[in-house]
Amino acid sequence: GIRDCLLSRGLGDVYKRQLQGRGVLVSNEYVAARAEILKSNLERMGVSNAVVLNETPARIAEALPEFFDRVLVDAPCSGEGMFRKEPVAQQQHCEALVKQCAELGAQILDCAAAALAPGGQLVYSTCTFAPEEDEGQVAAFLQRHPEFALADVLGNVDYTFGSAGEENRTGGLSLDVSKVRRIWPCQGGEGHFMARLVKAGTPRTLPPEGEYTPEEQLWLAAAAQAGKKSKGKAAKPAKTADARSTRRADSRACRDAVQGTSRRTRDTGAGEATPAQSLAAWQEFARQYFPALAQRPAVVHGGGVLLSVAFPQTGLHVLRAGVFVGSVQKGRFVPEHHLFTAFGSLCTNCCLLYTSDAAD
């Protein structure tokens, strides 16, 4: 799994390509409003194996000790690299802010270290020039955590970017600054800093694609059991319709889902069907339009159906775990935008969706 303290669109797309549908990408944002934006970004990118949390780093570390194989800490910082783009950042800047951000970054790094599995890798990044948050931060972390070693950010790649760190910015602590990187504004960046740290131990390996470890199978079963206990309204009986009108309705619903223009209640609202009815409706829809997904583990959450990911039930505040594929409305299954961004290439019988309605 990968835990990301703050995920931007670009970072999410990179991890989506690297994971290739395997493992789980856990993305956390402490601010509730930004967490909702994060969830929407992952949906638009079609990430199918993501979990979005709205939690504190300390609670994550406590609930998931040594759980993650990769951790990216895009730390909250004083934002000195944003002075050129955001004048308000310069107006708000002060020494107290730098100190506060350095202390907060240290706390987050300690939590990330506890959540990282043996042999895992931790990447720390900021967009500030302040040495207390950059070279000094990494040097102090290594003193607190001797189980970590500094690795070259560039690794084995055949290209370079930015420049090495600076020895006079370590606060008098020992650090091989040649292994960290800065990207100054004159180098096409915005004052970015990054370092890569490796935890002692043997790295774990992911199971083959489409397979789950025994532990992951237990997590999926627990999620399914929790979904069966969720409350939902009784399903309204569907009106009798011929095959043509049914396909026309499917076409319109799928068109709205593909375009992301649906005004329907999201997965945070109550559904119209019981969990069992919702799952049955999804499976019927999937057999016709997404047969490759019909047997994927699915759960019901907030009245909607999600293709779940293998993630333990920890009591953490989870905004999204998996792909929200749709919900039952007015007695029929209505697909969601996320279904098409994540699995649109798997859709079959498309001619039934796009040719059944002359208006399409």
Regions found by a protein language model. Name each.
Residues 135-156:
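Conserved Class I S-adenosyl-L-methionine
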Residues 32-33, 70-110, 123, 128-135:
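Mobile active-site "lid"/loop adjacent to the S-adenosyl-L-methionine
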Residues 24-29:
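Conserved SAM-binding motif I beta-strand of class I
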Residues 20, 116-117:
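Helix-to-beta-strand junctions that scaffold the AdoMet/dcAdoMet cofactor pocket
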Residues 1-11, 15, 354-358:
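Single conserved hydrophobic/aromatic residue that forms the stacking wall/gate
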Residues 62-70:
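A short acidic, Gly/Pro-enriched loop at the edge of an enzyme's catalytic core
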Residues 190, 200-356, 360:
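Polybasic, low-complexity RNA-engagement segments
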Residues 36-63:
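S-adenosyl-L-methionine
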